């Protein structure tokens, strides 16, 4: 998988990809990350890539010419072009899976300032938002995309690790504990120390349903629950 990130602030991207799972994925050649400085595609003085908006108003707007030149410099027939923007569809695990399973090259355009020339959308395949709030620029959103997609690719993390994470199978992850066994009178559940793997598995499945019902009931899809989880779900719903 190759990511091409078009940005005004390459250092933000560089600082992140030098750490943790992303760095290991690059070292394993599971992913490639290409950082493209948008200013390099400007033909104006001081590498200007923004200007005042027609019709007046506050805030600067990213100009179409450098954006399209940057996109076309890396785009191939196998590319998908994403734009980080508040008006995009909200990123979720289902969208992440679609990108990780179906594309070899993802171009991410980082939005900035007041926005971008609307004509840019003719060259964009998907607009993506990371939530209903405003951040300074699209770099953080682009890194969230890279991180979430990369961890689902082969040889990045163990398959078992991400299959048991929150949002897989439309459930939150079960509670986890480590040492010490007791802290301020709160103990680790005894079942986790029992050594009985079947009971531990059963407890974890129960806790996934309980936690999801309490904290994110909107996620649950009963068609994806196993028999034991469905029993817990029905019991919990009956108690509410």
From Swiss-Prot:
Does the keyword Coiled coil feature in the UniProt annotation? no
InterPro entries with a match to the protein in the record = Alpha/beta_knot_MTases, tRNA_m1G_MeTrfase_C_sf, tRNA_m1G_MeTrfase_TrmD, tRNA_m1G_MTases_N, tRNA_MeTrfase_TRMD/TRM10
Binding, S-adenosyl-L-methionine? 111, 130-135
| CDD domains xref list | TrmD-like
Catalyses which reaction(s): guanosine(37) in tRNA + S-adenosyl-L-methionine = N(1)-methylguanosine(37) in tRNA + S-adenosyl-L-homocysteine + H(+)
* Cellular component GO terms, alphabetical: cytosol
Q: Where in the cell is it found?
A: Cytoplasm
Q: Which EC number(s) does the record attach to this protein?
A: 2.1.1.228
Subunit structure as annotated in this protein's UniProt entry: Homodimer.
Give the family this protein belongs to, as stated in its UniProt record: Belongs to the RNA methyltransferase TrmD family.
Identification of the protein by name: tRNA (guanine-N(1)-)-methyltransferase
């Amino acid at each position: 998988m190759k990511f091409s990130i078009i940005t005004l602030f390459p250092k933000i991207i560089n600082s992140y990809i030098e750490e943790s799972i992303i760095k290991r994925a690059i070292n394993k050649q599971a992913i490639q990350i290409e950082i493209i400085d948008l200013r390099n595609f400007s033909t104006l003085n001081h590498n200007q890539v923004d200007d005042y908006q027609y019709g007046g108003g506050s805030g600067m707007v990213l100009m179409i010419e450098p954006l399209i030149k940057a996109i076309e410099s890396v785009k191939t027939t196998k590319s998908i072009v994403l734009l980080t923007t508040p008006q995009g569809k909200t990123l979720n695990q289902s969208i992440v899976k679609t990108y990780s399973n179906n594309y070899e090259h993802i171009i991410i355009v980082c939005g900035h300032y007041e926005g971008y020339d609307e004509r840019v959308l003719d060259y964009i395949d998907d607009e993506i938002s990371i939530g209903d709030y405003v951040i300074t620029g699209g770099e953080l959103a682009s890194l969230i995309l890279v991180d979430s997609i990369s961890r689902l690719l082969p040889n990045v993390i163990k398959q078992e690790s991400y299959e048991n994470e929150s949002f897989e199978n439309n459930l939150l992850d079960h509670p986890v504990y480590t040492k010490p066994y007791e802290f301020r009178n709160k103990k680790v559940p005894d079942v986790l120390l029992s050594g009985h793997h079947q009971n531990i598995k059963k407890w974890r499945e129960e806790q996934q349903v309980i936690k999801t019902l309490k904290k994110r009931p909107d996620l649950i899809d009963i068609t994806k629950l196993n028999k034991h989880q469905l029993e817990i779900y029905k019991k919990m719903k009956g108690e509410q």
